């Protein structure tokens, strides 16, 4: 039986999706859940997205949005806008909201102190290599920086902009960033907040929500087309995180009241584990 006291010194990584960012100011239960976790001694890291806000600003500036395999093509002009929105706007709004509520936090981007070292990422369409521009793939996380900050009782809030060894900045998919950070720290949980309740066998049937799933089942569901579109890269990130050190991953609806608290007790969303999906493994 899970108990809140077991959170002491455990690492909880939270990915706050851009699709739910507009609800943050009114989401008092999210703030309350963070306070509960901190009171229990948990070490928290938040990585945020911001795709909708980026698209809005690109449209304002009459810059075309182009995606390949769900990844935003990011040229030299677009990366400036992406960094401005993620690091300059959304990141600081998150920090401001938490600080106002008495939660100690600090805003960072992956550029700061080489937090997220990247190399250029490519994708393939029908086995043809496609250039995405300034889109990055993380190969190293500065875990010492994050651990030092958490040891001070401060929550790092991270914008998914990375850098290479030459100082070039890269746009990183926030799910991939959260997965990489979580696995590098061997986090006890990665909780991905999105705008759906979890993984469904049939997206049109609310009773088909999958509560627990293992890596083998994820691969089978993707192959058989049970999950598709934007859920595929999310599940691939979940699988990557589990395979590389994270104890468990949960995909939950960030618009639900006390979603973080309920996730800890496995009362919402879909939980991804390594072993038997019928016997949900104890992660904390």
Curated annotation (Swiss-Prot):
Substrate binds at residues 50-51, 72, 171. The record marks 15, 234 as: Transition state stabilizer. The keyword Transferase applies. One of its GO terms (biological process) is arginine biosynthetic process via ornithine. It comes from the Bacteria. It is an enzyme of class 2 (transferase). NCBIfam families: argB. This is Acetylglutamate kinase. It comes from Clostridium novyi (strain NT).
